[in-house]
Regions:
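Acidic/aromatic-lined carbohydrate-recognition and catalytic surfaces
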Residues: 1-159
Length: 159
């Protein structure tokens, strides 16, 4: 029987910010991960699952992505990422990226466009609701406390 690779692999998740700091700024980074690849391989790791490293205002620990095509500066550069990936492959390691596609940062280009008008082509990428009796559309709470809704004065709607 031919089993798929992820069914028999040792997968190690790395949260970059706290894994390994290569430049002494107190924040883990891609070069710190690269420096520890031999150690991870010796542990028997087959696959590295990397938490988000994309550009983000970091209001949600990097899960609020503002640019899916850029690396957050504190983690390094795209060149650092390419080098890390190349070094992983040299060691026979696979990489799984944590890709957040069900929401973006409010600083993402799509969201900023969606706020410009009610008929913007990006408007339907997000949930927009009219106020209910001058207040939030419902009582949904945010994971971090308070209301899940933010008011947009420009369009008189909540998102």
């Amino acid at each position: 029987m031919n089993k798929t690779w992820w069914k028999n692999s040792v997968i190690y998740q790395i949260y970059p910010r706290s894994f390994a700091d290569s430049n002494g700024d107190g924040i883990g980074d891609l070069n710190g991960i690269t420096a520890h690849l031999d150690y991870l391989k010796e542990l028997g790791v087959d696959v590295i699952w990397l938490s988000p490293v994309y550009q983000s205002p970091n209001d949600d620990n990097g899960y609020d992505i503002s640019d899916y095509q850029a690396i957050m500066k504190e983690f390094g550069t795209m060149e650092d990422f390419d080098r890390m990936l190349s070094e992983m492959h040299k060691r026979g390691l696979k990489l799984v990226m944590d890709l957040v596609v069900n929401h973006t940062s409010d600083e993402h280009h799509w969201f900023m466009e969606s706020k410009k008008s009610k008929d913007n082509p990006y408007r339907d990428y997000y949930i927009w609701k009219d106020p209910k009796d001058g207040k939030e559309p419902n009582n949904w709470g945010a994971c971090f406390g308070g209301s899940a809704w933010e008011y947009d004065q420009e369009t008189d709607m909540y998102y």
